[in-house]
C-alpha cells in the first residue's frame, strides 16, 4: 500500500456485500484519518499474568512469550467461520487486544461454521454481532468491532494483521504495506475441503525458541583435553542433543574453565558423546559436571506476499500428497481470478465452472516462473477444488483456525518456528469414495444454516448427519470443541438424532483458557450441563442430553447393551489412558466407530477406529513413562523433578495416608488383621505412623502444630542428612576405589534453620497449617506470631544412630522388603496403641492434594519442601509455576492445538457417517504446531489370525445363544459340546474377566459339580456377584485345542442370556 502502488486517497472495494458470502465480504482499503478503536486500545496497560487462568497455556508458551502476547494488538479482517475461529483462539490466548473487521452481513451459509451467529442475526454485520460474544471469552482482552474502511494509520496500530477469505488483490495491497512497516501478516483461506495459509513476519524476526521443548541436560563422565574436546556423558541415558545445538557447563571439577563460559556449539558424535571447543589449554578434567542445552535466539526472514507468490516455499502437510501444495498454489490463484470475473465462486459440483477453473489454472501455470510451473497440471485436483470452493465447513475452519492462531502467537512472541511461508491442506478424501453422478441440485442453497456444508456434500449427507446418535465421553477442552463442531455440522440435530455427553467434573477457572463453551460465571457448575446448554444456544436444533457419570464398569447399568446398540458412534475426549482403553473395549464389543484424539501442548493426535476395517486404540500403546527409582527419591536425588516428587510423597504420607489409616483403625474392626497381613515391613510402618498420630505427635493447640512442623523440618533437612553422611561420609570410596558420592549421587549437606530465611518460615507455616487441618484445629497465616513461637523453641539435637541401613540400589531395597520384621516390636506397638473405644468420636481429616487453590497451603508446602531438599543436594530450585507442573502432573494445553485436532477429528467423522470402506480414505494424524510438523497416515488394518481355514480379527467373536428353545439355559457341558460339534474346538480353559469357570485341570469333584450347572449360575458362584438385570450378555475367553491337539488362538465368546 505504498504510494507507488496505490495513491493516498484511492479506495479499492471488493464485491457488493449482497453477493454470495462464500466469495467474500466487502473490502475497502483507504488512507486518511485513523478510526476510533486504535485510541481505545492504547488504554490497555501491560498487566500481570493471571496464572490461575493461563496456567496450562503458560506451560506451553512460558512467561516471556506470554508477556509478548499481552503486548500485541491483532486485527482480524473477515468474520466468517475461519475468522471467528482465529479470533476465538487468540482471545483465549490472551493478546493485548483484538479488532474484528468485516463490512459484510451475515447470510444463511455463514451459520454452517460461524458459531457466533444466530438465525436471527441474518442481515446484520458479522463483526458487530460477533464482538460481544467473543469479548466474553477473556475479560483481559478488549475486543473491538470495526466496519469501516482500512486506512494506513489504523493498520499501523497493530502488531499482527490477519486476513481471512479475502481477494488476492486485497491481500497483495495489505501485504505490501505490512511488510514495509514491520507488521506481521497472516493470510488464511478455506474453500470447502481445501485450505491455504501464508505467513510474512518480516525480514528480521527474532526466533527465541524453535521447538518449545524443555532444554536438555546430561551428567558428564569425561572431557578430553584436545582440539576439539570430546565430552562423554553417563551411560544411564542418551544426551539427546543434535549437532548445531548450543550448550553450557556447570559443576565441572578440574576443567573448571568450562564452567560459566558462553554457549558452545557442539557436534554430536554418538548417543553419549559430542565434541566442543578447543580444550587443549584447559586444566585436566577430574570429575562431575552437568551439561545443559541453551536456546540461542536467531534471526529468520520472510519474503513479502508478492515475491513469495512467485517463488513459494511450502510446508508439506501430507507426504502422500506431496505434489498437492504446488498444484493448489496454482489452483488458488486461478480461483481468485474466477471469483473476480464472476463475483462468486464456482457453483457447487458444476461441470461448466469446473472446466473454466481448469482453463484458468492452465493459464496461470503457463505464466508462472519455472520454479513454480507444473509440468503436468493435476486436472482432477483442480476440478475438485472447483466442486467444493463454494462450501464453508466448520471442521476445516477449526483446523485452519488453530493453525493460523498459533502463527499469530508465533508472530507476537518469537516462540516456535513459523510456517515458511505457504501451507496447503486438503481433505478431498471426505468426498464420496465412488464418484457417482453428484446431482448439482442436491448442493444448491436452501436458505438454511447448513448451506455451506450442503454445497460440498449435498443434502442427503446432511439428512444422514441429523439422524446420527453419538456418545461423547468428556466435556473438557476437546469435548467443548467437538460439541461446537457437532452443532455446526448438524450432527444429531434431526428428529431421530441425539448426542449424549457425560463428564463428572465441574468447571474451574483454569478451564476457561481453552474450554471455550464456559464463562467465568459458570465456575463450579457441571461441565456436561453447561456445555450442552452452550451448544443449544449455538444451534437450537441439536438434540443433546447431558450426564455426570464416569464411564467404567461401575456405570455399565447406565451405558448398557440398549444404550450402545442404538449408537452410530463414540467420540473420546478423555485425559487418561485407562479410560480410553475401557471405552475402546466397549466400542470393539459393540462394533461401533470410535473417534479418538488427544493433545499435549502444541502436539496432538487423531485416531479413527472403524469396525472390521481398522485396528482399535488398544492394538498399539505408547511405552510406559519412566518412573523415578525409590532409592533416588529417598536418598540420592539429582534433579528438581526428584525433589518435587519427594515433596509430593511427603504430602501424601503426612497429611492424607496417616489420617486415613487412623480413621480406619478407629472404625474398622478388621483393619488390624489386614495390616498385619501386609508384606515386608509395611505392618510396622503403618502401626508406627498411627502411634505417632494418636500418641507421640497428637497436637492439642496451634502452638503444638508449629512445634511439630519445626521439629519435622530438622528431621528432614538436618538430622536425616547428617545420618546419611554418617553412613556414607563425603570421602567414602566404593569397593572399586571410586568416590561413592560421584556421578548421579550428589553429596548433600545439612541445613541450619534460620528464622529470617523466607523459605524456612514458609515451610513451617504450610506444614503447621496442614497438620492442624488434619486434626480439625484452627491454623494461622500470621507470620509474626509463628516467628515468635519459633524463637522460644530449642534446636533439636542430632545423635547418629547405629544399625541404620540406607539402601543404595533398588536391588538392596527389594531384598530388604522380603525380610521378616521384629515381631516383639510389632507387639509392643499394638499394646501401645489406644484402643478405639477410648477415642470414641475422635477422627482425623485427610487432605486431598489440590494444586490450583493458592490459598490452601498445598503448593506452599510442596514448593518449600522441594526447594529445601534441593538446597540439601545443591540442585537448582524451581519456582511455584514449575513445581505445580511436576507435582500436579499437569498436561500443558493451548486452545490452538485443540481447535486444529478437533477439526481433523470431524473430517474423519464425515467419512464414518458416509460409510467409507477403503482403508486409505481414512487418516490418522499427528501434528506439532511448534515445529511445525504434520504427519498423516492411513490406519492400520486389524491383525489377522486363523484357526483351521477361518480367518478372524479383534472384531470377530463367537455369538452363542445361552437360552435354549425350551427356555432353559445352556449348561457348561452343553457349552463345551457346542464348540466341539459346531467348531471342532476342544475348550481346555474358560474364563470370564478374572474368574476361572472351567479348566481341564480342575479337580474331578468340582468339574462334575459344574458340568450340569447353567453358565450364569457358575459365573455368579465363582465371582460371588449376582448378575444385574441390565446384563444381557457375557464375555467369555477361551483356550482351545484343535482336533489334532494343537493349541490355537480363537476369538472371544459373546454369550447371550437375554
From Swiss-Prot:
PROSITE patterns: UBIQUITIN_ACTIVAT_1 (PS00536), UBIQUITIN_ACTIVAT_2 (PS00865)
Tissue expression remark: Expressed in testis in A spermatogonia and spermatids but not (or at very low levels) in pachytene spermatocytes. Also expressed in Y-bearing ovaries and at very low levels in adrenal gland.
Active site, UniProt feature: 631 (glycyl thioester intermediate)
Keyword annotations of the record: ATP-binding, Ligase, Nucleotide-binding, Ubl conjugation pathway
UniProt GO MF annotations: ATP binding; ubiquitin activating enzyme activity
Entries under PANTHER family matching the protein: SUMO-ACTIVATING ENZYME SUBUNIT 1 (PTHR10953:SF162), UBIQUITIN-ACTIVATING ENZYME E1 (PTHR10953)
Assembly notes: Monomer.
Protein name listed in UniProt: Ubiquitin-like modifier-activating enzyme 1 Y
